[in-house]
Amino acid sequence: MASLYVGDLPQDVNESGLFDKFSSAGPVLSIRVCRDVITRRSLGYAYVNFQQPADAERALDTMNFDLVRNKPIRIMWSQRDPSLRRSGVGNVFIKNLDRAIDNKAIYDTFSAFGNILSCKVATDEKGNSKGYGFVHFETEEAANTSIDKVNGMLLNGKKVYVGKFIPRKEREKELGEKAKLFTNVYVKNFTEDFDDEKLKEFFEPYGKITSYKVMSKEDGKSKGFGFVAFETTEAAEAAVQALNGKDMGEGKSLYVARAQKKAERQQELKRKFEELKQKRHESVFGVNLYVKNLDDTIDDDRLRIAFSPYGNITSAKVMTDEEGRSKGFGFVCFNAASEATCAVTELNGRVVGSKPLYVALAQRKEERKAHLASQYMRHMTGMRMQQLGQIYQPNAASGFFVPTLPSNQRFFGSQVATQMRNTPRWVPQVRPPAAIQGVQAGAAAAGGFQGTAGAVPTQFRSAAAGARGAQPQVQGTHAAAAAANNMRNTGARAITGQQTAAPNMQIPGAQIAGGAQQRTSNYKYTSNMRNPPVPQLHQTQPIPQQLQGKNSEKLIASLLANAKPQEQKQILGERLYPMIEHMHANLAGKITGMLLEIENSELLHMIEDQEALKAKVEEAVAVLQVHRVTEPAN
């Protein structure tokens, strides 16, 4: 198997679109578009797994930078080991690029020096180039060759710089060491009459000056700041220590410090801002409350009045838009954590105005996102464990057998197909002959399930049920013979080692005509194990006959809204099977099981749109055909 990373994807591209594109290069095992845990929006990249490395290499060579939704995609080999990606070996940094140079232009320029693993031009939120980029070569030799050849060259009329990539931590460490050896000084907060000569006279006592400049406006007036460059580091440090904070009159205090580049200054300001924000958050932690679902008539004063009985309030604010209308939420800050806790206990859910309030401790955006992500992952883990621990017995209303492990994969390559059961997930609803309407006999299915959802026949149960209760005789031998004949006709087979009932034998679990109904068996027939006990699940309500009509989508949607997740799949399966059976009767069971891996919303769309269903069915048939061709002979 070979895996490719596909980046720079538009937000609306999904697995289906990528499958259509990459399947032309060769058999695709799986495709996964990476999405946000909470919003499920695409993160802009995906992984495509090919069966053969040659097919993946063909896709990389022929499809890299192809347009998808009028946007070029970026393809490279997937590096699963993060140490290889972050080592910096073979990585080259390019800056001073022309704004017209994109990823493809960089790739075409540098591919002459060696095999490129990845290349990227940095862009802003609008997709405009930031003027720098990166190229990752397979070998360090190719990277060094590109530096020697391209550094100082003209690309689109601009002289570019090409050098070895230095990780951010090393750059910051290097800048920190350089910061101690500065000679250039930044000066601000002096009066408007300060010119270049006055600036020189002011700083000259602290050492030899190589250059000095007061920045001025177009009319010649000072902007209030300037620069002084000393010959030695000692002189610059002495000037900073002596003059920083000096009173300049007119209420101004002189600011003198090491001159910084814009990016360095912005980074330092950002770091200080984060520190202040963290301190402010820590100071109000446990005392600041978030209040939402506020009535439109509630303002700051009414919010304070509502919360004032529970403690001393330091601030209360209802958030408003530009026109002063309430946004429906606000914040209340108490003096003590115990007061805030009391307010949450008493006011959460209480009606204030005309709406019940939601009151909780305020959280930062990052904390709230992390908390929601944690909740979502716990919920998904619980659902997986619940499905893993349950074995479902097909009941009279459905033939759906839930897969042991859930899967979000929509496309099934040959490797996935080899893991499929020989028997489909869908068990046929076997209608017993009239002579044995009460007999319950278990059998493993070999075909699909009954297409008609209304008037569902009684399903055969395991013959082992009689081992735990009374074993009444069936009057006559015709019922047993008919049951055995019916099982042969439906393709059912008994479990290995299970004795078949002879015509004159007693049938365990059978019902005497006109007698009371036997209790349902707690055993289940499978093709590879002996009658494992299964937990009793409640019977789902059979789907009404009217759902088989044309105008049934609204009724199905209403049933799904009131059903549990397992029952939703059963309802959709009962509706899909007869539609698929008309297209491919022999494969209807397997195809239905494959399609039920898809999300319910898309299944509903396929029920309404015959063309969409037909396309998806043909796709599943193609996968099964590939599986049959590639499956080794037994």
UniProtKB/Swiss-Prot annotation:
InterPro entries according to UniProt: Nucleotide-bd_a/b_plait_sf (IPR012677), PABP-dom (IPR036053), PABP_1234 (IPR006515), PABP_HYD_C (IPR002004), PABP_RRM1 (IPR034364), RBD_domain_sf (IPR035979), RRM2_I_PABPs (IPR045305), RRM_dom (IPR000504)
Pfam families cross-referenced by the UniProt entry: MLLE, RRM_1
Domain of life: Eukaryota
GO biological process, one term: male meiosis cytokinesis
Gene3D superfamilies: 3.30.70.330, c-terminal domain of poly(a) binding protein
Keywords annotated in UniProt: Repeat, RNA-binding
RRM domain residues: 2-80, 90-167, 181-259, 285-362
Record's subunit section: Core component of the neuromuscular Atx2 complex, composed of at least Atx2, tyf, pAbp, Lsm12a. Interacts with Atx2 (via PAM2 motif). Atx2 and pAbp form a subcomplex that can associate with the 5' cap of pre-mRNAs independently of tyf, Lsm12a or me31B. Forms a ribonucleoprotein complex (RNP) containing at least me31B, eIF4E1, cup, tral and pAbp; this interaction is required for the translational silencing of maternal mRNAs during the maternal-to-zygotic transition.
NCBIfam families: PABP-1234
Protein name: Polyadenylate-binding protein
Native organism: Drosophila melanogaster
Protein encoded by which gene: pAbp
